[in-house]
């Protein structure tokens, strides 16, 4: 019966929006969990000539050519290391499937509207136009990224051309 009580308790708690939490350096970021298709370990990719450094290349994911973006390079991180913790979050953004390279994935958090604060007017590593806000969990701050807006910016149009070159 305790299992049933736990299910009921969880179902009756106020629901919020769920975010996949990932790390880039010392910062924690969150993206809408509904955009996440899967999480994979980092594998070598096929590099595409004449693309910015943050576009690592493309990979074949079960017959689908998926462009891979290293958010660490995109967000101007200095020390980018590929190790056992480095993962690729594969996102399904409607018309586009994209993989983003991050330092690691920690958990999935549910945030209520009260826990989400407006994005500040300044951001050092990321333009505020790509932020949906800041998630406050006690003393923990989570930078909430509008991943669709980030990956639909003009420079990301290069992803489509890179993927079509390989296809």
Curated annotation (Swiss-Prot):
Task: Indicate what this protein is called per its UniProt record.
Answer: Chemotaxis protein CheW
What range(s) does the CheW-like domain occupy? 16-156
Q: InterPro entries from the entry? A: CheW (IPR039315), CheW-like_dom_sf (IPR036061), CheW-lke_dom (IPR002545)
Keyword entries, A-Z: Chemotaxis, Cytoplasm
GO CC annotations on file: cell tip; cytosol; methyl accepting chemotaxis protein complex; plasma membrane
Whether Ubl conjugation counts among this entry's keywords is no
Per the record, the major location class is cytoplasm
> Matching PROSITE patterns, A to Z?
CHEW
Function of the molecule = Involved in the transmission of sensory signals from the chemoreceptors to the flagellar motors. It physically bridges CheA to the MCPs (methyl-accepting chemotaxis proteins) to allow regulated phosphotransfer to CheY and CheB.
């Amino acid at each position: 019966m305790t299992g049933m009580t736990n299910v009921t308790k969880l179902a009756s708690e106020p629901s919020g929006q769920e975010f996949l939490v990932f790390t880039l350096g010392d910062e924690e970021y969150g993206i809408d969990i509904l955009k996440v298709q899967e999480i994979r370990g980092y594998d070598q990719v096929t590099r595409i000539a004449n693309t910015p450094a943050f576009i690592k290349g493309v990979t074949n994911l079960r017959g689908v050519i998926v462009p891979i973006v290293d958010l660490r390079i995109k967000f101007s991180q200095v020390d980018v290391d590929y190790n056992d913790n480095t993962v690729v979050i594969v996102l399904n953004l409607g018309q586009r499937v994209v993989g983003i390279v991050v330092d690691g994935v920690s958990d999935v958090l549910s945030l209520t509207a009260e826990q989400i604060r407006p994005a500040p007017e300044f951001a050092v590593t990321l333009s505020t136009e790509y932020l949906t806000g800041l998630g406050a969990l006690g003393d923990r701050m989570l930078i909430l990224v509008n991943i669709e807006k980030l990956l639909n910016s003009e420079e990301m149009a290069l992803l489509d051309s890179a993927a079509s070159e390989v296809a």
